[in-house]
Amino acid sequence: MSAITQFTRFKSDKSEEMVKTAKAAKAIFEKHGAEFFRMSRFHTGAWAGEWLIVTRYASWEVYGKAQEAVAKDPAFAKLMAHIPSFAQLSGRSISVGVDL
């Protein structure tokens, strides 16, 4: 089964707020089926200074169910309303793993 991985990039100079918000988001996404939720920061290249959020799901089915559940979660809605006050979404990509 191929894993589904979502990569989301944010621009923000508010490191403490990014970390605090990512910790809250991690609990929400993992509660709803993400295998993991990770955050890192680019230090070189075209995206230097941007933040990267990575979530992984076991399959498209799990991904779909998780997205549906997250969309209905009041805690997630609260986070989504807060994020624009300190960060800007700059990109999102989804990759499908290849089982070797």
Predicted features, each with a name:
Residues 1-77, 82-100:
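Short S/T/G/P-rich N-terminal loop/turn motif that feeds into the first structured element of a domain
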